Swiss-Prot record:
This is Beta-hexosaminidase. Its main location: cytoplasm. HAMAP family: NagZ (MF_00364). Pathway: Cell wall biogenesis; peptidoglycan recycling. GO terms for molecular function: beta-N-acetylhexosaminidase activity. The active site is at H187 (proton donor/acceptor), D258 (nucleophile). Its EC number is 3.2.1.52. The record marks D185 as: Important for catalytic activity. It comes from Neisseria gonorrhoeae (strain ATCC 700825 / FA 1090). GO terms for biological process: carbohydrate metabolic process; cell division; cell wall organization; peptidoglycan biosynthetic process; peptidoglycan turnover; regulation of cell shape. It is found in: Cytoplasm.
Amino acid sequence: MTVPHIPRGPVMADIAAFRLTEEEKQRLLDPAIGGIILFRRNFQNIEQLKTLTAEIKALRTPELIIAVDHEGGRVQRFIEGFTRLPAMNVLGQIWDKDGASAAETAAGQVGRVLATELSACGIDLSFTPVLDLDWGNCAVIGNRSFHRNPEAVARLALALQKGLAKGGMKSCGKHFPGHGFVEGDSHLVLPEDGRSLDELEAADLAPFRIMSREGMAAVMPAHVVYPQVDTKPAGFSEIWLKQILRRDIGFKGVIFSDDLTMEGACGAGGIKERARISFEAGCDIVLVCNRPDLVDELRDGFTIPDNQDLAGRWQYMENSLGHEAVQAVMQTMGFQAAQAFVAGLASPQDTAGGVKVGEAF
């Protein structure tokens, strides 16, 4: 059977269960689609996951990019057979107790284990690290944040990024320019952060600047309004994405929208309007999750935006470890020691640091 050559489009969709239905196969062959995000509902066990990712990748060439939210703590989509990952604030606690060096070493090990285990199952990308500061206000962020100190967040995120690279994965910093100060959960409401740009620059933006300089591959903006900067949510704002992120910070990587079905995005209109505004603001790729009907509505008559960088940016997000290489790494004593170390950092309290996120439970 000839695999069709279909360039990756700018939409990331999802699927319902453990295997692809015929309807989903046809949807994923649409030129609008370039990637797929998996959730806990798509995971039964490791062998099933490997079969699913192979099935997805066999549909077309270049292969669809497969992503997942797999941060640790409350946001770890795959559990059985995977190392239980700590919430990121555990690394911040190590920073406070044992110092920066110990915390950075731990963060590197977490990133390495996280990425290698996903790579072994055919996953290209985890949407991590969270760069939001822990201001103590936002339950949906909570212990997903490394720390309140911008330097600690940046250094721990950079160490995690280096670990991810050892496991074949790129990084995606979120939620630009910072979701940690607001109380509202943008899955449910459209939060507002009333601080000035100078205040944001002095704290929340610092990790994004540092990580951008250090090779962060992707960014996901927040569905949060910062009215002193722009009346539009960051993910719909040319000021935030084209002027501040691209021009001022100098970020060259991929901009993924956060899920366009979240309540924080719904005020922009229907799904076609949300996507149009996202692309015009500067997003390369939009996520449409948990609503296949909206994916179908979006792709009906969809015109792929003119983005000369899209193909290269998608390609850059591909996993860099081949199957044989990752299997060999998994068998080494060093990697198995890293798994044991990371598992020892996790505890039941890691899942209790705030509300559930998407499909975290």
